Each structure stands twice: as C-alpha cells, then as structure tokens.
C-alpha cells in the first residue's frame, strides 16, 4: 500500500534521555534516535532490517514496544523479506533489542531466489517459521507472553520440499520469562489465508482472530481450544482488516480491510467500515464509518483520554490523508490537527504503525526502521 506517512521533525530524541518523552511539544512527531543491542551469540551479531507486514504493540510490564520483524546476520541467512525475530524497543532509553531470533536460516537456489529452512538448533528448541505475521500478533499481560497465528512465507522448506505458507499455519506462544516458543496444536482454528488480524480480549481471556472473509474465531487461552464465534461481521473479502480491544466497553473494534488493492479505486467504502464485537454475547454492531480508507491500520488506544488514534497518507490522493481520532463514547471520528507533518514513507508497504505508551503518556509511531513519539493535546 502506497502510504507516505509522518514527516520527520528536525529535532530528535537522543538515546538514553527518558525525560524527553515526558516533555514533548504538543502534537509534534519527534524521531527517537535509538541504539541497537547485540545478541550474546557472536554468530548472531547483526542488524535490524524492517520488512513490514506486521504490527506493533505496547508491553506495559516491560515498558517497551514489541514487534516481529527481520534480524539480519550470517547465522540466520542474512536478508529475506520475512520476519524472524521478536524485537523490543525501550522508548525512554531509546534502545532496540532483538529478544528472540528464530532457529531458521536461508539457502540460495541455483535458479535464483532463496529458501527458508531450519537450523539444527530447531530440533532442540522449536521456533516458528519466519513469516509476515501481519496483524495476527499480540501481547497477553496475564501470561507475560506474545502470541502469533498463521502468516506468509512462500519460500519455506519441510524436509527439503517447498511447502510455503503451510509451514506458517497455526498459533505459537512465546513465554517472555523463559524466552521459549511453544506451538499451540489445536484443531478448528482459522484457515491461513493471509493478511489477517488478532488481538487479546482480557474479559474472556481469549484471542479474537479476524480472518478469511471477515469471519471471527475465538481461542480460549485456558483451554487452549479454537472455536468459531457465534456472529461475525457480514461476510466479504477483507484483506488488511485489523482488530483491537476497547477496554472500558469490553469489546473488540474491527476496522477496514477489503479486496486486495481495491483501496486504490475510490470510493472503496468497505475500507472505512468499523464494527464492534461483544466477546461476552458474541454479537456484532456496525459503528460509524471512518473518514478515510484503512488497510492494515493500527488503532492506538490512549487509555488516559479514552480515545483511539489512526493515521494514513495517500500519495496519489485516492482518499483523505491525515491523523484521525475515534471517540468511542460518542461513536465519532475527527481529524487531529498536527503541529508537524506526518513523516514520509519511501515504499509501497509504508503504512503507519502506532501504539500508546502508557508509561510515558505518548503515542509511539513506527515508519520503516524509524520510531517517533507524539504527545497528544486536545485543542492545540
């Protein structure tokens, strides 16, 4: 998707200066100039290389932003377009850490291109196949764990045979205390049709998966069981739909999505749809349409102000561009007036990623390999 996004402010947050985040100018995107930590394993020393097709979430326990993307080093095969590592960004300390690198590597082929295959370490300690996780990724505070489900990797090998996305089927849990992955082998889960979304619902202690044709699945974290939800939004193609939890109202918000690349042809009204899913009754309600088209869009929930924030910039002016807030109390959208422009993207998958840092009371934005912070002030 060819979003431009948040324009770089001339000032930046210096590494190690946590106080900067609590004293940001109002409604101004400021870059966080971070330093990158290295793994203890000398063979795994490398660098972060953003690939996109993922989601960022805030971990209030670790006071950090979590996301799954690409770590490039010799041991794990260098560059591919697929994520292979859980990262943590400490916004206050301005440090990025590779928390867990998967035990997979890359092999070049004689015909050109590459294949993804396991390292010997994966026999002793299984890890998920590298992938685009899309939005099927979340942190569960009650379990101090990260969960992923399904995803894409068309280069994946099993026993020397190309099986592609099939190696990304199913859900995994990363226990952050032990730093170990566990495959959650449970039948009846959502099919892996790519570009899906998932979010944690604390009121039912479950993961709600928004998948193929906008159908919803529920994963009971206590029973480790999947089942289809009683009701889902009206069935249709919904690549790039996203789902987020609304804490005060104890419901899930399901935003946007549609036919692949159909947002390029206005009005593309399906990309503006917003629905609420009640996890207790498993009923669905249509809410106010968004002011622009949303594809793989983050709805960042600001718990202090009880507002959701989202952003999108369309370089061909197919739809309105800007940063928008959704007031769940009044079921109303409005545009946020910024003191600085939104930093730019330079590639087609440059959608804006955002989450709310409750410790520092600011929004954290990710644009390619850059991170930004913004302190929202109403009326300025």
Enumerate the language-model features and the residues they cover.
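Kelch-like beta-propeller repeat domains
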Residues: 19-380
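Sec-dependent N-terminal signal peptides
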Residues: 3-12
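Sec/Tat signal peptide C-region and signal peptidase I cleavage site
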Residues: 14-18
């Amino acid at each position: 998707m060819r979003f431009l996004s948040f324009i770089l402010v001339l000032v930046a947050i210096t590494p190690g200066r946590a106080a900067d985040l609590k004293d940001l100018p109002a409604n101004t995107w400021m870059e966080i100039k971070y330093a990158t930590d290295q793994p203890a394993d000398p063979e795994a020393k490398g660098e972060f290389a953003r690939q996109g097709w993922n989601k960022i979430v805030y971990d209030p326990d670790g006071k950090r932003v979590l996301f799954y993307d690409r770590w490039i080093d010799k041991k794990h095969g260098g560059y591919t377009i697929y994520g292979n590592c859980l990262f943590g960004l400490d916004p206050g300390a301005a440090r990025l850490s590779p928390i867990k690198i998967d035990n997979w590597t890359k092999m070049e082929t004689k015909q050109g291109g590459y294949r993804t295959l396991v390292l010997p370490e994966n026999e002793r300690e299984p890890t998920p196949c590298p992938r685009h996780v899309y939005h099927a990724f979340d942190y569960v505070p009650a379990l101090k764990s990260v969960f992923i489900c399904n995803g894409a990797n068309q280069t994946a090998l099993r026993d020397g045979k190309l099986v592609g996305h099939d190696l990304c089927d199913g859900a995994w849990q990363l226990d952050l205390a032990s730093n170990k992955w566990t495959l959650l082998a449970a039948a009846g889960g959502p099919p892996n049709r790519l570009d899906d979304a998932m979010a944690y619902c604390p009121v039912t202690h479950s993961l709600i998966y928004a998948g193929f044709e906008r159908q919803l699945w529920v994963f009971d974290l206590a029973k480790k069981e999947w089942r289809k939800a009683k009701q889902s939004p009206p069935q249709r193609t919904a690549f790039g739909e996203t789902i987020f939890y609304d804490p005060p109202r104890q419901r899930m918000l399901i935003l946007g999505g549609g036919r692949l690349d159909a947002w390029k042809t206005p009005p593309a009204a399906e990309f503006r749809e917003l629905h609420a899913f009640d996890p207790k009754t498993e009923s669905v309600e249509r809410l106010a349409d968004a002011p622009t088209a949303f594809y793989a869009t983050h709805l960042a929930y600001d718990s202090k102000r009880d507002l959701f924030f989202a952003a999108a910039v369309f370089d061909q002016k197919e739809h309105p561009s800007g940063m928008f807030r959704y007031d769940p109390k009044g079921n109303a959208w409005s545009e946020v007036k910024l003191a600085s422009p939104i930093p730019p993207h330079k590639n087609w998958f440059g959608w804006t990623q955002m989450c709310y840092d409750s410790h520092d009371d600011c929004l954290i934005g990710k644009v390619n390999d850059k991170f930004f912070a913004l302190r929202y002030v109403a009326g300025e």
